[in-house]
Amino acid sequence: MSDGFEQKEQKPFNTGREETIMEETKQVGKGILYGLIAIFSAMLLTSLAVSLLLTATSLEESSFNWLITAISFLSLFIGGFISGGKGKERGWMIGALTALSFSLIILLFQYLGFGKTFTAEQLIFHLGFLGVCMLGGIFGVNMRGNRSST
């Protein structure tokens, strides 16, 4: 029995854009997490190696300053590279978010643990970390082999 007012099946206003945004957000978050894990793993291994060298030899800590700085920058480049590779798009942004997350973790550790904020020298280092990690993210996105060309 038809009364003239047939109800049409209403399509939801959402056409799948929210699912796409959620998937992209998961991808970015996953990339940042993998990048941070890589950074902290590399720094942990470096700390272990340097501490073993300091205890086993007569070397002093000051002789490792430049090596530790170079390895720190390399670690952040690798972390940005991994985060950009996992994120698959916008490597500069994912690299920047990875570096900012790293800097925030270090700042929180330093402030909550020691009651100190960043010095001017540390701030310059963390700005350098930001640039290097962004560069790593750009390379990470562009080195992925399974991208399709249009």
Swiss-Prot record:
Coiled-coil ranges (or none): none
UniProt keyword list: Cell membrane, Membrane, Transmembrane, Transmembrane helix
Transmembrane portions of the chain: 32-52, 64-84, 94-114, 123-143
Gene Ontology annotations for the cellular component aspect, listed alphabetically: plasma membrane
Subcellular location: Cell membrane
Main subcellular location: membrane
Pfam family of the protein (one): DUF3792
Annotated membrane topology: Multi-pass membrane protein
Disulphide connectivity of cysteines: none
Origin: domain of life: Bacteria
InterPro entries: DUF3792_TM
Protein name as it appears in the record: Uncharacterized membrane protein YrzE
Species annotation: Bacillus subtilis (strain 168)
Gene: yrzE
